[in-house]
C-alpha cells in the first residue's frame, strides 16, 4: 500500500511524496529527488532527525545517541528508519533548497471571478485534468501577478486533490493583485502559482475544534471543512466556527457554510460583526462570542486565522481568562499594497 507523505521544510515549503509500507521515508524521498540530510542510513548518526506531526509509523531501529526514548515519545523520527503505516506529515529540520527540492509551479486558467462581498473577490482556476494540486487543508499558495515578477500569498479555499482551486482575496484599494483582479483579469486568463506553503493546516481531528476566522481568514477554514466533509466519517468531533468581520457587507461564503453544515455532522457556525449598527444577531469581536461549551473545559483544538491584531487579541483573551487549549494553531495575514 502506498501512503502520501507531506514533507514540511524549514523554509515553509511542503512537498508530497508517496511511500510504501516497507520503504523508509528517506528512501522514498530520494526516489523523488529529495536529498534529506543523511550520514549513515542506519539509525546511528541522527543527522536526518525530523518530527512526525501527523500519522502512524514504525520508527525502525536506531541507537539512543541518534534518537532518545524521550524524543521518540514526543514524535521525533529518523526518516532513514521510519516506515509510514498511514499518510503522514513529517517536518524536516532543513530547508527545501538544502534538500534539492524543486519548486512545484503550476498554471491554472481562470473560470470564474466574482465579488463575494463589497470587500472580497473570489475566483476559481481550472488546473490541467492530468494534474492534481496537492496541499494540506489550510495551506497557501504564492500567486504570480500576471505581467509582473511579483507574487502574493493566498490560502486555498478549496479542498485538496481537485482539478480546480479557489481563493478569497481582500479587495485592497492600492493592492496590486486585487487591483488586477478588479480591473484587468478576464475569464480564461492563465495564472501561475507555486506551493504549497505554511504550517497552518488541519491536524488529525481527535477532539472538539474551535475555528476563529477574521475577514478573508475564512479561506483556509473553508478548505478544512470541505476536506472533513469529504472524509464521510461519523466519528469526527464537533467543529465550531466563529466568523468575524468589521461590517455586514464584509461577510462572504455564508451559502457555502450553510451547505457544509448539512454535509458535516457536528459542524455549526456563527457570525459576528464589529459595527455597532450591524443587522446581524451578534455584534462585537470573535472573543466575545466564545462560550464555555466552545472551550470544552480546555479539551479543544483552536485554529485562528486573521489579521495580526485579531490573532493577538485571541492570545491575550485566552491568557486573561486562564484558558489553555490542548493545541493552538494560528496564521496571521496582512495585505501587501503599493508598488
Swiss-Prot record:
Belongs to the bacterial ring-hydroxylating dioxygenase ferredoxin reductase family. Disulfide bonds: none annotated. InterPro entries: 2Fe-2S_ferredoxin-like_sf, 2Fe-2S_ferredoxin-type, 2Fe2S_fd_BS, BenC-like_FAD_NAD-bd, Beta-grasp_dom_sf, Cbr1-like_FAD-bd_dom, FAD-bd_FR_type, Flavoprot_Pyr_Nucl_cyt_Rdtase. Pathway: Xenobiotic degradation; benzoate degradation via CoA ligation. [2Fe-2S] cluster binds at residues 40, 45, 48, 80. Electron transfer component of 2-halobenzoate 1,2-dioxygenase system. GO terms for biological process: benzoate catabolic process via CoA ligation. Binds 1 FAD per subunit. Binds 1 [2Fe-2S] cluster per subunit. Monomer. It is part of 2-halobenzoate dioxygenase two component enzyme system. The other component is a dioxygenase component consisting of 3 large (CbdA) subunits and 3 small (CbdB) subunits. Residues 3-96 form the 2Fe-2S ferredoxin-type domain. The keyword Flavoprotein applies. Pfam families: FAD_binding_6, Fer2, NAD_binding_1. The keyword NAD applies. This is 2-halobenzoate 1,2-dioxygenase electron transfer component. PROSITE patterns: 2FE2S_FER_1 (PS00197), 2FE2S_FER_2 (PS51085), FAD_FR (PS51384). Its cofactor is FAD; [2Fe-2S] cluster.
Amino acid at each position: 500500500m502506498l501512503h502520501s507523505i507531506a514533507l514540511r521544510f524549514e523554509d515553509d515549503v511542503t512537498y508530497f511524496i508517496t511511500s510504501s509500507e516497507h520503504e523508509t521515508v528517506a528512501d522514498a524521498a530520494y526516489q523523488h529527488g529529495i536529498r534529506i540530510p543523511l550520514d549513515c542510513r542506519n539509525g546511528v548518526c541522527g543527522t536526518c532527525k525530523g518530527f512526525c506531526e501527523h500519522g502512524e509509523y514504525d520508527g525502525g531501529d536506531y541507537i539512543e545517541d541518534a534518537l532518545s526514548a524521550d524524543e521518540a515519545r514526543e514524535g521525533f523520527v529518523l526518516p532513514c528508519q521510519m516506515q509510514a503505516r498511514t499518510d503522514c506529515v513529517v517536518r524536516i529540520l532543513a530547508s527545501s533548497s538544502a534538500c534539492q527540492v524543486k519548486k512545484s509551479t503550476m498554471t491554472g486558467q481562470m473560470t470564474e471571478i466574482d465579488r463575494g462581498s463589497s470587500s472580497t473577490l473570489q475566483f476559481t482556476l481550472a488546473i490541467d485534468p492530468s494534474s492534481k494540486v496537492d496541499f494540506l487543508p489550510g495551506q497557501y499558495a504564492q500567486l504570480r501577478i500576471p505581467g509582473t515578477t511579483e507574487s502574493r500569498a493566498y490560502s486555498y479555499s478549496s479542498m485538496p486533490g481537485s482539478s480546480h482551486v479557489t481563493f478569497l482575496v481582500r479587495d485592497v484599494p492600492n493592492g496590486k493583485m486585487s487591483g488586477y483582479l478588479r480591473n484587468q483579469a478576464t475569464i480564461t486568463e492563465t495564472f501561475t502559482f507555486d506551493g504549497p506553503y505554511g504550517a497552518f493546516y488541519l491536524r488529525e481531528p481527535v477532539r472538539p475544534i474551535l475555528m476563529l476566522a477574521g475577514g478573508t481568514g475564512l479561506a483556509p477554514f473553508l478548505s478544512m471543512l470541505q476536506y472533513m466533509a469529504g472524509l464521510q466519517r461519523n466519528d469526527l468531533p464537533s467543529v465550531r466556527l466563529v466568523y468575524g468581520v468589521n461590517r455586514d457587507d464584509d461577510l462572504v461564503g455564508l451559502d457555502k457554510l450553510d451547505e457544509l453544515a448539512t454535509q458535516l455532522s457536528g459542524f455549526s457556525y456563527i457570525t459576528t460583526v464589529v459595527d455597532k449598527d450591524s443587522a446581524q444577531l451578534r455584534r462585537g469581536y470573535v472573543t466575545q462570542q466564545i462560550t464555555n461549551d466552545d472551550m470544552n473545559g480546555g479539551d479543544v483544538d483552536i485554529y485562528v486565522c486573521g489579521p495580526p491584531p485579531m490573532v493577538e487579541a485571541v492570545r491575550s483573551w485566552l491568557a486573561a481568562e486562564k484558558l489553555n487549549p490542548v493545541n493552538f494553531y494560528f496564521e496571521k495575514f496582512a495585505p501587501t499594497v503599493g508598488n
